[in-house]
Amino acid sequence: MYKSIIASALTLAALSGCAYNVENPVDHVTYRNEPLVDQIKDGMTKQRATELGGPASSEHTLSGNRGTCNDYVLNREGKQQPYYVAFDVNDRVMSKGFMTCAEHEQNVREKSRM
């Protein structure tokens, strides 16, 4: 009984960590050759990221004055996919992924509550 409770708790803990980066791996395969996805790396300057990815569809200030976040819309075969690139206060890429800036901010808020 004790072992099954521990196993269940460990399984739940492992799965809860996955809940914060909800990204479809198919999106990465579909858009992997897009300059925004392929070439933008953590630590890159905002200027260089904008040169590679082009102008963002919108830019947001991150909560807590942590930096800014650019929303992009990737297009392929009639399908639109949101993609965000977040920059720290030094205008360096700190994260990116297949979601909007608003979804990214929500994930950050949920993680900080834990």
Predicted ranges, named:
Residues M1-I6:
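Bacterial N-terminal signal peptides that target proteins for export
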Residues A14-G17:
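C-terminal motif of bacterial Sec signal peptides marking the signal peptidase cleavage site
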Residues S8-T11:
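Regulatory sensory/coupling modules that transmit signals to nucleotide-handling catalytic cores
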Residues A19-M114:
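Residues within mature, well-folded domains
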